[in-house]
Amino acid sequence: MRELTVRLSFTTNCLGDVKKYVKDAGNKRWPVYFMPRMPNGGKIRFQANWWTSSLKYAAKVMNKHLREVNGVSFEVAVDGRTDSNIDHFYKRHFKGNGDESKFVKHEAFFPGDIIGINCVVPGSISDDDFWTLMDYVGRFRGISPYSPTEGYGRFEVVTIRETPARHGSKDISRR
């Protein structure tokens, strides 16, 4: 097992799905969708099971590592920031009653935004194979709190690197 840090660059918008109401200047309430956050309200959170189900799909496409992907564990906190100004949120347009066009705002990662995720990968999956698995996830599934099946959250893999030790050095001296 080894811990890896994966950097991803979004190719389509990745939209938040946590519905909250905000008031405009006229005191009217509007629904706005935010990214899910860690309990302390800080980092953006992507559920580990989103990654797991997408990796299972990628393993089927690759026809390799069908069992081993069950051993991949993802940290739920995402290393990435969005623009917190609601005026800059993504506008998702849809048809209202009749032919009128409406929109709702989503906090989002936009194409070109880069995030980092940490995961633990079994030794039986090589770095090259893990890259290929993540590439399939990014091109065909995506990762987005709001409707990845509608094409949101597609990405390209930028880098995969071993995560530096967090608790001291690998060269530990004992007395």
Residue ranges and their predicted role:
Residues 1-175:
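RNA-interacting cores
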